[in-house]
UniProtKB/Swiss-Prot annotation:
Residues 798-810 have a biased composition (Basic residues). Residues 190-202, 726-742 have a biased composition (Low complexity). Residues 445-514 form the MBD domain. One of its GO terms (biological process) is positive regulation of transcription by RNA polymerase II. Residues 107-122, 353-363, 542-559, 774-784, 853-862, 869-881 have a biased composition (Polar residues). This is Protein MBD-R2. The gene is MBD-R2. A zinc finger (THAP-type) spans 5-59. Keywords: Chromatin regulator, Chromosome, DNA-binding, Metal-binding, Nucleus, Repeat, Zinc, Zinc-finger. CDD domains: MBT_PHF20L1-like, MeCP2_MBD, Tudor_PHF20-like. Residues 140-160 have a biased composition (Basic and acidic residues). It comes from the Eukaryota. Component of the non-specific lethal (NLS) histone acetyltransferase complex at least composed of mof, nls1, dgt1/NSL2, Rcd1/NSL3, Rcd5/MCRS2, MBD-R2 and wds.
Length: 1169
């Protein structure tokens, strides 16, 4: 029996071929949507609605369907028919039904706690259906009354009908929402196996889960596995006739077994099955219209402005972002455009603090913005003396959110599921929880206590933000006894001592940001601008580093004393328009000229009150502005706006803005220290090679006790920073104008954190003592050693090797600097220990050929004690650390060539270049003795390892063992490298044979014969191409005849005969450059040109064959061998046959020997195991 549409006057039926392709849909189970279907279809209320009562697809709009992969259409949930034979429903009536349906669904989820179980509660369904049926009866009566009246008031009645229908729908939507409340209050407690009872233990809380209500393909839900675990899943296919769903379990790396017994991750389940549930969301999704402005999410939690282009349905929109990119975004990831602030607030802000205009460079001493802190500021500007008083309020390192003033409900954060991966809510890059603290040293460290249901009772999870790394959050677990843990290793040892098992899923030290972003639990408020991570500062390598540091410290030092809370933890200011220190070289700007300016600037900074110079982080956000270099850039909707007034272009990243300024606004480029290039950005995106990578240090390398001690030391170091700045400022003010004091003992490549406070204070005192002395003249060798980079042995990158060309001996100081003797041995020893100076290698190789050997002059060859005396310095000598690591001067190396004496003969030492590689079979990467180079891989190897001891034994062409026996090489390419007999005509000759004077002539004849053979092969290929062209010329309709639309030979002759002539460039007329149409191609002319071309090529091939024949005749005349045509060569044939037989025998023996060796190797490996 076929299916038929139940709508009156609809001819759709599945029994006729003309209705093929029409789909039929049964009435939905939801009573509210079913009532709308009955009302719109005008079905009699007395008719019983069963599964056989169907509505065809002709009564739905195209917008009501979803397109699935196989091209079929699937009806969306919660839609109703609107197209009928008596006409299409009015748009206002359709919108009224949608609003009533949405209002009823929202009220049902928020006000009725038992609405999730409405499908199983017959009383609730019956009451709801009775109310809707009553509304439909009253509406049908009004419709009949309007149809009977055929007077002139018919037009007014038609207008009033939609209004009455809308009021009826609203009433029908409001009444059922109140009816289930009363019914559910009288209902009994649901079964313990239901989803709502398992996740909502309190009777007053609304249910978190319900039966699947979103049946679209790809919708998320949770399914109960065979083991009894609720696992996340997605809908793959929907079968409306059988009311079943094909569910695919999402793969989880924590699953040890398959979620189903059959071993597959897909399973058919009934829609009403108790093994399926979906989370109820109380969040009302915003509704957008066409061409409406909105804030849509990009790849992360940040949202950017865009415009709605299309309404795709299923709460999905096509958004055109302001930068021109188009993307489909769901409504959960979109917000309405925020309202602009009233002009009164802007006026008040301008009165309180007038910001600098956009695009203007920052002045040399702007006011530093301070972080807002929730703690109370204690003390006044003169209360610096009460720094260590116990009555002072506890400071807070970071501006944590005020939990009391934060409205969590308005943010629309979802509830964290208690199954699967753990996470917590994040607002403005901060976890949401209970405010807490940890006592570290003498103060309290503010933390956030987050709830983790996996931890055993009594355990507490603290999350805190580091004070030295912006935005970095760490986790500390506190046991019931009060013991703190920050690493897995310490916690594992503790649990093992307590006879407990360590479970990494329970004791988790990860913060799980990605999980929070996936479930939309990571949000930003409207007035918050996320601060990008700070970039590393460029290292100062100039000679005036100490002077620059003292100047910057003096600028950053306030003239009036500040409270402890502000002075210790204030934001680093932004750099001014002064060029960076690495660009100020002594050649372009002498120290004598810059000193008065510097002193004047220091005086201005000291007289300026609290004005401070901004130096460090270029991303200080203040009232919607960011300082990039020396420019103040506006931030609008998380985008950087170009500082040019008439430009107003926006960019997502700072680098793109700098590139735009460098290319289009060169007047602003001078205010930025560094404008990146596209090549530099491409290099940053590439993955570093294994040579550039340094071995990674484990994250949890610091023990638990040392970590908290280190945190305390950092806080103490920050509190003492102003003392060191004042000392350095005093030292700078007392320095004469003609002295540029440098950190002579510091390497410019070393990072400041590696210096301990005691050593740094010692270095500061040494600088002061050096400044007190008379004018000093720098030694050129000393300045050169100061600029040379060093690498610690433990920090040497992979791929580098330490050879003698990188070694040098420690030499005494040759400088006549009187101030240099002020250093004591204790200071030198402390500096050596603080910088982990590598010990110079004292081994000197005695035999080298092509390598970097020890620099021993010829006059001291016979003195073996010379190397020891040079390589081992006396402990009483005054040595310089940098001079000991620097290489010997270039003058001493280039005075005379270096030699060694071997068996009474002098051998000259050739130094290897830095880029040359040593790759020997002994796997020793140092030069030792005679070195030979492979012709193929160009790697150097030890001659002794390859059986070559003397230089006379080195072959003319040497191929190493690795190139001769490559791994997994083809047999046909095994002797690819040995082709001298083909190209040079040289045949292998045994060493025990006597020299043949005719060998050179024979090799020449063989080479010429091989050349002729190659020419014959080239002529054969040319003849093949001529045959192909002849085949093309025979066929007039051949598709490749167009290639000869022009003559080939004439073009070649003209191009070779013409010589380039330099002519004056003519000015092009102001005529439009319009492309001219090409002339039509005549196949007959192409055929004629091809035949002419074949004739020319044929003549060239014949001439080439004639030349080859002439050369062959000449070679035959030069051949001095006897003609063997008539000679008796039977003896020679027998000898060759015997020789070939013996070769076959040797080949078999070699094969047997190889098999025996393989068996022996396998046997040895088995015994060793």
């Amino acid at each position: 029996m076929g299916r038929r549409c139940c709508v009156a006057n609809c001819p759709s039926t599945s029994r006729l071929l003309e209705h093929n392709g029409v789909t039929y849909h049964s009435f939905p189970l939801d009573p509210i949507i079913r009532a709308i279907w009955i009302k719109n279809s005008r079905i009699s209320l007395e008719r019983q609605i069963t599964k056989s009562v169907l509505v065809c697809s002709r009564h739905f709009r195209r917008l009501d369907f979803n397109t699935i992969r196989n091209g079929k259409y699937l009806l969306k949930p919660r839609v109703f028919p609107t197209v009928f034979p008596w006409g299409k429903m009015d748009t206002a009536e359709i919108e009224a039904d949608q609003r009533a349906l949405q209002h009823a669904s929202v009220e049902g989820t928020t006000e009725t706690p038992g609405n999730a179980q409405s499908s199983t509660n017959d009383d609730v369904i019956k009451a709801t259906v009775d109310q809707i049926v009553a509304q439909i009866l009253s509406e049908s009566a009004e419709r009949k009354a309007t149809e009977e009246g055929k007077t002139g008031k018919a037009a007014d009645d038609v207008k009033n009908t939609p209004e009455s229908g809308e009021d009826a729908n609203k009433a029908a939507a409001k009444e059922p929402s109140g009816t289930p409340v009363a019914a559910s209050s009288e209902a009994t407690v649901p079964a313990p196996g239901s989803a709502s009872s398992s996740n909502s233990p309190l009777p007053g809380t609304p249910p978190k889960y319900s039966n699947p209500h979103n049946l679209t393909i790809g919708a998320r839900l949770e399914a109960l596995s065979v083991e009894g675990n609720w696992l996340p899943a997605r809908i793959v296919e929907v079968n409306e006739t059988e009311q079943t769903l094909l569910v695919r379990f999402e793969r989880n790396h924590k699953l040890k077994v398959s979620p189903s017994t059959s071993g597959s991750f897909q399973e058919w389940m009934a829609i009403k099955s108790e093994r399926l549930r979906q989370r109820l969301s109380n969040r009302v999704l915003p509704v957008f219209e066409l061409d409406e402005k909105c804030m849509a999410r990009w790849s992360g939690p940040r949202k950017f402005p865009g415009t709605i282009r299309k309404l795709l349905g299923n709460d999905t929109y096509e958004v055109l972002f302001d930068d021109g990119y188009v993307k489909n975004v769901r409504a959960v990831h979109m917000n309405k455009m925020p309202k602009q602030l009233p002009p009164v607030q802007v006026a008040e802000e301008g009165a309180s603090k007038s910001p600098t205009p956009v695009g203007t460079p920052v002045s040399s001493a702007p006011v530093a913005p301070k972080r807002a802190s929730t703690g109370s500021l204690g003390g006044s500007s003169g209360s610096s003396g009460s720094k260590k008083s116990k009555c002072a309020p506890q400071r807070r390192d970071w501006p944590l959110l005020d939990m009391a003033s934060l409205d969590i409900a308005s943010l629309g954060l979802p509830e964290i599921p208690h199954d699967g991966e753990w996470t917590c809510h994040w607002v403005n890059d901060q976890p949401i929880g209970t405010e807490g603290f940890l006592i570290v040293g003498e103060h309290q460290k503010p933390t956030v206590i987050v709830q983790d249901w996996r931890l055993p009772p009594g355990w507490i999870k603290h999350m805190y933000q580091r004070s030295n790394v912006l935005g970095k959050w760490d986790v500390i677990l506190v046991s019931p006894s009060g013991k703190r843990f920050r690493s897995k290793s310490d916690l594992k040892l503790f649990l093992e001592s307590q006879n407990l098992v360590y479970n990494p899923d329970v004791y988790d030290f990860s913060i799980h940001r990605r999980r929070a972003k996936d479930i939309n639990a990571y949000v930003y408020t409207h007035g918050y601008n996320p601060q990008p991570p700070p970039k590393p500062r460029p290292m100062d390598v100039s000679m005036n580093s100490t002077l620059d540091q003292s100047i910057t410290s003096q600028h950053s030092l306030p003239s009036t004393p500040m409270p402890v809370k502000e002075s210790q933890y204030m934001e680093a200011p932004v750099a001014s328009l002064m060029p960076p220190a690495e660009l100020m070289s002594p050649q372009t700007q002498p120290a004598d000229e810059t000193k008065p300016k510097i002193e004047a600037e220091i005086l201005e900074a000291s007289e300026g009150g609290t004005s401070q110079l901004m130096l460090a982080d270029p991303h200080v956000v203040e009232n919607g502005f960011a300082f990039i270099g020396g420019l103040k850039v506006k931030i609008q909707d998380n985008l950087y706006v170009c500082p040019r007034e008439d430009c107003a272009k926006t960019y997502r990243k700072e680098d793109f803005l700098l590139i735009h300024i460098r290319h289009y606004h060169k007047e602003f480029a001078e205010h930025v220290s560094h404008c990146p290039k596209m090549q530099e950005l491409a290099v940053k995106r590439t993955h570093p090679s294994s040579i550039d990578q340094v071995e990674a240090v484990p994250k949890n390398q610091i023990p638990n006790q040392q970590f908290f001690a280190k945190m305390h030391q950092q806080d103490l170091q920050q509190s003492r920073s102003f003392k060191r700045q004042s000392v350095s400022a005093t030292a700078t003010s007392s320095t004469p104008s003609d002295i540029t004091p440098t950190k002579a003992l510091l390497s410019p490549k070393m990072e400041p954190p590696s210096v301990s406070p005691t050593v740094e204070s010692g270095i500061k005192q040494e600088d002061v003592s050096l400044d007190a002395g008379p004018t000093q003249s720098f030694n050129p060798s000393l300045s050169r050693s100061c600029k040379r980079a060093r690498l610690s042995p433990s920090k040497r990158p992979s791929g580098s090797r330490k050879s003698n060309r990188q070694r040098s001996q420690r030499r005494p100081i040759l400088s006549d600097n009187p101030a240099g003797h002020g250093l004591t041995e204790q200071d030198v020893e402390e500096t050596r220990q603080s910088f982990n100076t590598p010990t110079p290698d004292t081994r000197i190789d005695s035999k080298k050929r092509r390598s970097g050997a020890a620099t021993t002059p010829i006059s001291s060859i016979d003195s073996p004690a010379m190397g020891d005396s040079v390589s081992t310095p006396s402990s009483n000598d005054q040595t310089d650390i940098n001079a000991a690591l620097a290489p010997p001067p270039a003058e001493t190396l280039s005075k005379a060539p270096q030699y060694i004496k071997e068996n009474g003969e002098l051998i000259r030492i050739v130094r290897m270049r830095q880029e040359e590689i040593i790759n020997c079979i002994c796997e020793y990467g140092e030069e030792d003795g005679l070195m030979i180079q492979c012709e193929l891989c160009l790697c150097w190897q030890h001659g002794a390892c390859n059986g070559i001891v003397k230089e006379a034994d080195v072959p003319d062409k040497y191929v190493c063992y690795i190139c001769r026996n490559p791994q997994r090489g083809r047999d046909s390419m095994r002797f690819k490298h040995d082709q001298d007999w083909l190209f040079e005509g040289k045949l292998p000759v045994a060493a025990y044979h006597t020299a043949n004077p005719q060998a050179t002539k024979q090799f020449e004849l063989l080479k010429r014969s091989h050349t002729l053979t190659g020419n014959l092969l080239d002529a054969k290929r040319s003849m093949h191409s001529l045959l192909v062209k002849i085949n093309i010329a025979r066929n007039r309709c051949h598709p490749k005849l167009y290639l000869w639309a022009k003559k080939w030979d004439e073009d070649n002759l003209d191009s070779t005969a013409l010589t380039p002539v330099k002519r004056a460039k003519l000015e092009a007329p102001d005529l439009p450059n319009v492309p001219q149409p090409e002339a039509a191609i005549d196949p007959e002319e192409c055929q004629y040109r091809l035949i002419e071309h074949i004739k020319v090529q044929q003549s060239l091939v014949l001439d080439r064959l004639n030349d080859i024949e002439a050369e062959m005749d000449e070679l035959e005349k030069e051949d001095t061998l006897d003609d063997l045509k008539d000679a008796d060569i039977s003896t020679t044939k027998e000898a060759l046959a015997t020789f070939i037989k013996e070769l076959e025998t040797m080949k078999r023996l070699a094969k047997l020997n190889q098999v025996a060796n393989m068996k022996q190797t396998l046997r040895d490996s088995a015994t060793s195991k």
